Amino acid sequence: MNYVYILKCKDESLYTGWTNNLEKRIKAHNNGCGAKYTRGRGPVKLVYFEFFENKREAQSREYYIKKLTRNQKLQLISSKSIKEENYEKEINL
């Protein structure tokens, strides 16, 4: 499974990425081993994700989302919000 995800950083900025292991990747971001952008901006919080069968689709979607404005990303997040109590169970955080 491949995932595209959006994180909200401690400074309220948004980070978009893709991975094939969402649980491991979020832990890496929170441990300072993720993307340079999220280092020093943690802890991060998962606010949105989608899953895809193949890497190419996930990377294409990530590219699309990264080009959105902040307001468009916030609309995307609110249209498919994650219930906090459920997403932690879904990805074992």
Swiss-Prot record:
Domain GIY-YIG, residue spans: 1-75
Domain of life: Bacteria
Transmembrane segments: none
PROSITE patterns per the UniProt record, alphabetical: GIY_YIG
InterPro entries in the record: GIY-YIG_endonuc, GIY-YIG_endonuc_sf, UPF0213_domain
Record-linked Pfam families: GIY-YIG
CDD domains in the cross-refs: GIY-YIG_UPF0213
Family classification: Belongs to the UPF0213 family.
Listed PANTHER family: UPF0213 PROTEIN YHBQ
Protein name: UPF0213 protein CPE1444
